[in-house]
Amino acid sequence: MSGAGIAQVGSWLRDSERRFRLLAFGGALTMFLVQPPADLWMLGWLAPLPWLAIVQQPRLAGRRPWLVLWAAGFAHWLAAIHWLRLPHPATSIGWVVLSAYLAAYVPLFIWLARGLVHGHGWPLVLAAPLAWMACEQLRSWVLGGFTFAALGHTQWRWTTLIQAADAVGAVGIGGIVMAGCAGLAALARSRIETRRAGVLRGEALAAAGIVVATLGYGGWRLATEPAPSGSPLDVLLVQGSIDTELKHDPDAAGDVARHYDDLTMAGLEQSDSKPDLVVWPETMWRWGLVEIDPAERLDEAVVERMLGPAAADADAKQGEERQARARDALARERLDALAVYARRYGTHWLVGLDKQVITPRASGGVEYFNCGLFLDAAGRPLACYDKMHPVMFGEYVPLADRFPFLYRLTPLPAGLTAGREPVAVEIAARLVAPTICYETALPMAVRGLVRTLTAAGRRPDVIVNLTNDGWFWGSSELDMHLTAAIFRAVEVRTPIVIAANTGFSAAIDGSGRLLERGPRRATATLRARVQPDGRRSPWLALGAVAGWGAVAVVTAATVAGALRPAPGRTTAPAGGAVPKEGRRLVPEPRSGRE
């Protein structure tokens, strides 16, 4: 570059508003690059630096700095969750709306952190992690929670570091990464602000101490891993590769069943020994179960189809008996086909499928469930788990149970009903508990499952996740979903195995190590031998105390700052802006102090 060009760039950067925008959108870019698909994970310790530079600025440049920050967040989230547009044209609306909502956390983080730094004089290495954790905790809770693309998730490969998730959760790991980044920022500033160099170096040292202490804790937790006891659970995870679309295809059910059956038989033939459990992903058995409430009276034509004509002299009691037999026959009809497959596999089988419960208590007469059904080697059903946490707008529309017309505005024909309780089934002397789809993305859902079953004396030895990620065409959604499961395994100290259509099927131990992983958008069968963990964890006992603690501290400090009288205040608030040309809003105080 010529001297004139360098001078031109220098002149451009001297404009405070342009520099501010560069930092805002530069941070959006770096925070995107540390997540899949780029996945430059080690840069996670540097990625927040542009936003931290904004936090440290005495004033924000430009007339609408908060709008600029929101726009930067909007650009970031549009790129980070671009895969949300893939399932159906209508989901592009959800992609934009969700990105617009998530974008608000960028200005919120900077506003909170600036209030702590400039309003209370807190060091950046304390203010930034607390503000970040508060925002991520709120993001994991508001509207049911959205936890993908968390800062802590970038570090899933650093097994020693993420052991602390069993105490502070994934949100806390993000706070630790932010503390490390803030320490680097303080160290960099110490070379510029020579008068405060000692203080800033002390802050950097404190941040390094936090990271070192986290690694020390992680090393200790890894040293406490239980020795293998008894035989591992031998699981065959079947991963087909069928891209999922919202369209009616009368041949799809048979094609999907044949696809998965062929893969299963091929997987079984690869070994002389049978696995303890075969697992198919979510909804890969397309002929759903049917249950009929005894309070529901079947049409007589349906009863005749199932049982034949009634006797001419049948009385009311016999009519009720025929109703009960017909209900049982309808339910058994769907189970009989499943039993054929289970007997051929000759072992336990966990299969994802839908279920309809016909009942007068439902507003439309039918409740729909997303289920995981256990069958034994003889084809007998052992237990059925109904998904407890349906995805908002993906599997149900809020208030549509009262206003059914809302479904006509979406590609969904109907909404799912939430299941009522978790299930654990004993297989080969191990207790196995299923989850479905994004339940592994919800920290409190998995914690609740383990705590509920533990209270009943049935703490799971293994959690199985059934998921159909074929909606997302092999995109970075697969990586984000798998990463969430890794953190859940550490938090509850329970191995997780995943059967995923199009990937990633996986086996994860109780320390978050990825033992097996299937390919992206391709078929595979994984033979995972899973050892229970069973360690207790602070997360199981206390939950998101670190995340909510950060929310409480930051909220209290922010409210206190807002209520604190400021007589004689002569400068704009810490989060305020200055005009583009940089003029002061009020005269400089005589003392020169800000």
Residue locations for each model-derived region?
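Active-site catalytic loop in hydrolytic enzyme cores
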Residues: 84-91, 142-166, 340, 363-443, ...
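Juxtamembrane interface at the cytosolic side of transmembrane helices
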Residues: 556-581, 585-586, 593-594
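Serine residues within intrinsically disordered or low-complexity segments
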Residues: 2, 354, 589-591
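Amphipathic beta-strand/beta-sheet edge segments enriched in Tyr/Trp
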Residues: 363-386, 504-530
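Membrane-embedded alpha-helical bundles of multi-pass enzymes
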Residues: 2-224, 258, 466, 473-475, ...
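CN hydrolase (nitrilase-like) catalytic-core segments centered on the catalytic cysteine
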Residues: 102, 129, 278, 285, ...
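Soluble catalytic regions of membrane-associated enzymes that act on cell-envelope
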Residues: 218-392, 424-429, 434, 438
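Polytopic transmembrane helical bundles with strong interfacial aromatic enrichment
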Residues: 23, 46-48, 190, 201-202, ...
